[in-house]
Design a protein with these regions (language model features):
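A glycine-rich dinucleotide-binding beta-alpha-beta segment and adjacent secondary-structure elements
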Residues: 49, 58-70, 77, 104-109, ...
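A conserved FAD-binding loop/helix module that cradles the flavin
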Residues: 360-381
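Generic, well-ordered alpha-helical scaffold segments in large soluble proteins
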Residues: 1-5, 38, 42, 89, ...
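Hydrophobic (often cysteine-bearing) scaffold residues that line and stabilize catalytic clefts
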Residues: 28-31, 79, 83, 294-298, ...
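Surface-exposed helix-capping loop/turn segments at secondary-structure junctions
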Residues: 4-15, 42-45, 109, 187, ...
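FAD cofactor-binding and catalytic pocket of flavoenzymes
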Residues: 33, 163-282, 335, 345, ...
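Glycine-rich loop(s) and the adjacent beta-strand/alpha-helix scaffold that form part
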Residues: 76, 92, 101, 105-111, ...
Length: 391
């Protein structure tokens, strides 16, 4: 459903749930050509896409014009984003956006345990919005923070936190990026960043010394980010200028490693308070040996691909991406915060519809999964409203 609504363009995907995408794959740029050349030389299977960028007209959105710099926005709106897809549709169907508002807590009825609405601050005034149902989408730091800050007589340790699950099992993906220099110009910015991907290393392989796996895709750090990459290698002054003037000769790959969920990686409330007088989030995080082994293996594969494609110098920067978890989906309230429909175990008319509900990280960009999970929750919420169970 979401792939049709965005829409998604790409090759037929052979991994996971093999299927075709609504739009055909985009032409491959220099970075993608290098990735495909290296993977072919090593016998690694790779595919173009998937990306949520129109390859052909879609409604009032035109075909991608391949101007590059996709991470800074899309001049012609070929690239999907909520601002040009679901938000306009929601507004057209009666939704109201109250910008510059800060929700301070969820109001809970002491007797029934149901959510009554939310308290929020806007234009310096405290306000209250009554609601038959409440959906929280503050993401993996702010959603647990709001639940914890909503402690009340019914939930003295925070909403939905009777079993100390709120804020736990936060995850990031290991996301090292490895770049290689080529004699010919590459111009890696001239294509969608995740242009070509492989998930050949995604699943657990008993031959490896770690569980789960990683994916690899082309990435296209723009000049400012490229300068940060180079500076992280210790280059400065004249050496940094030389790397920057050579920018168009570099190709860059990125891995997404499925770091494991750990209960000690969590959000709690700090003593420090924000401008609204609310405790800010405190984030505790550490890696396990399995995480470190994954990232090391991913870096090795990326180096092999670039060398097989003909790279000379190769450099790597260690980085992380895609925070998820903190209000995870589970079979019961002893091990999570919401059920399979993103509905709170503790508060029957409270939903959480963001990446904090993911129980594991996966080794791919999580945006489409988050959107699909939220869409399923919306269907469930709407069905409840129609049947009268929302009241």
């Amino acid at each position: 459903q979401i792939e049709q609504e965005l829409p998604v363009a790409g090759d037929r995907w052979p991994w996971g749930d093999p299927h075709r995408y609504p739009h055909r794959p985009h032409p491959v740029g220099g970075n993608g050509e290098i990735f495909l050349r290296g993977t072919r030389a090593l016998g690694i299977e790779a595919r173009v896409g998937p990306v949520a960028i129109a390859n052909g007209r879609f409604g009032n959105r035109p075909h991608c014009i391949y101007r590059g710099f996709c991470l800074q926005g899309c001049k012609v709106n070929a690239k999907a984003s909520p601002l040009i897809t679901h938000v306009p549709d929601a507004l057209a169907h009666g939704a109201e956006v109250r910008a510059d508002s800060m929700v301070t807590r969820i109001a809970i009825d002491r007797e029934s345990g149901r959510a009554l609405g939310v308290h929020y601050v806007r234009d310096g005034r405290e306000r209250f919005q009554r609601a038959a149902m409440v959906a929280v989408a503050g993401y993996s730091i702010e959603t647990p923070r709001l639940l914890l800050n909503s402690a009340c007589s019914r939930f003295p340790h925070g909403v939905g936190n009777d079993f100390d699950q709120v804020g736990r099992y936060l995850m990031v993906q290991g996301a090292p990026q490895t770049a290689g220099r080529f004699d010919a110009e590459v111009r890696m910015y001239k294509a969608p960043p995740p242009e070509v991907s492989t998930e050949q290393f995604y699943e657990t392989d008993p031959a490896r010394d770690f569980q789960r796996g990683f994916s690899i895709q082309t990435v296209s750090p723009l000049p400012i980010t490229w300068a940060e990459h180079v500076a992280a290698q210790g280059h400065w002054g004249g050496a940094l200028r030389e790397y920057m003037s050579d920018y168009v000769h570099w190709a860059c790959l990125g891995a997404l490693c499925e770091f494991l969920p750990q209960p000690g990686n969590r959000v709690t409330l700090a003593e420090e308070k924000d401008r609204y007088g609310l405790p800010v989030a405190d984030f505790s995080y550490s890696q396990c040996d399995n995480d470190r082994a994954q990232a090391k293996a991913a870096q090795s594969v990326m180096e092999d691909i670039l060398h097989a494609a003909g790279a000379g110098e190769v450099i790597t920067i260690q980085r992380y991406a895609h925070l998820v978890g903190g209000a995870r989906m589970a079979g019961d309230q002893h091990s999570g915060v919401v059920d399979q429909f993103c509905r709170s175990f503790a508060v029957p008319n409270l939903y959480i519809t963001d990446g904090s509900v993911l129980p594991t990280q996966g080794a791919a960009n999580p945006a489409l999964t988050i959107m699909a999970v939220a869409a399923r929750a919306a269907d469930q919420l709407a069905a409840g409203a129609r049947s009268g169970s929302a009241s």
